[in-house]
Design a protein with these regions (language model features):
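Right-handed parallel beta-helix
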Residues: 77-224
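Fungal secretory targeting signals
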Residues: 1-20
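Short, solvent-exposed loop/turn elements at domain surfaces
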Residues: 51-53, 70-73
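Acidic Gly/Asp/Thr-rich repetitive segments characteristic of extracellular carbohydrate-active
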Residues: 23-63
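Short N-terminal amphipathic alpha-helices
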Residues: 64, 72-74, 96
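Generic detection of short hydrophobic beta-strand segments and adjacent strand-loop junctions
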Residues: 42, 68, 121-123
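Short loop/turn segments at strand-loop or loop-helix junctions that form parts
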Residues: 65-67, 156
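Acidic glycine-/aspartate-rich tracts in secreted/extracellular proteins
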Residues: 48, 67-70, 134-135
């Protein structure tokens, strides 16, 4: 009986992987985006393998089939500043000193944050990053799509990038990217931007059916 249950479970997992390819077809600016194409989907075992697969030059369909949690490397009593926008004291949002001169002459303070959020996961060319059901979560890090092309990100949730601090982290960063389709992506609890572009132009980018966080005020006034 135990062997039978194991076989059934293994078969179910294989079926989930086989059916977890990209759903739908990109359109408009994203029409030429193919990601990892028809490469056999595979799920990384842990955060180290996910990091490696995302960054390499191999075409891949990467299944996000569980929560990949990058939290745990805290910077304690690190340098931050108190910007003019923080009029709420301890209840407000201070800024992490990230070495670009943003804090300027603002009063300094110390803070504790998770280092993972400050730098996103590098994404190489020809990648499909696909969540499996509702399980696909990347916690503590965003995606950094810089100087690369042909990337699909679909059905994942990126969350918890130092939301209490300015410069806490970006969910998805594009810089010099080409042919990118971001679809059905949920973003929550980020300390800087949900989607951000850098100084280099990015071309043929399609955002569709994605869910940035909205407070009650914005939810009443914006269409998703």
């Amino acid at each position: 009986m135990a062997i039978t249950r194991s076989v059934i479970a293994a078969t179910a997992l294989l079926g989930a992987a086989a059916n977890a390819q990209v759903v739908g077809t990109p359109f408009g600016f994203g029409a030429a985006t193919t990601g990892g194409g028809d490469v056999t989907p595979a799920a990384p075992a842990d955060t180290a393998e996910l990091t490696k697969w995302l960054a390499d030059d191999e075409p891949r369909v990467i299944l996000i089939d569980k929560e990949f949690n990058f939290l745990g490397d805290e910077c304690t009593d690190c340098e931050c500043c108190i910007p003019d926008s923080n009029t709420c004291g301890d209840a407000g949002q201070n800024a992490i000193e990230v070495g670009i001169g943003w804090c300027g002459d603002y009063p300094t303070t110390t803070c504790t944050y998770d280092k993972a959020g400050l730098d996103g996961l590098d994404v190489g060319p020809n990648k499909s990053i696909v969540g499996v059901g509702d399980a696909g979560v990347i916690r503590g890090k965003g995606l950094r799509i810089h100087g690369t092309e042909n990337v699909i990100v679909q059905n994942i949730h990126i969350t918890e990038l130092n939301p209490q601090y300015i410069w806490g982290g970006d969910a998805i960063s594009l810089d010099g990217a080409d042919k990118v389709w971001i679809d059905h992506v949920k973003i929550s609890l980020v300390g800087r931007q949900m989607f951000v572009t850098g100084y280099e132009s990015s071309t043929l980018i399609l955002f569709s059916c994605s869910e940035p966080p909205l407070n009650d005020y914005r939810r009443k006034r914006h269409l998703l």
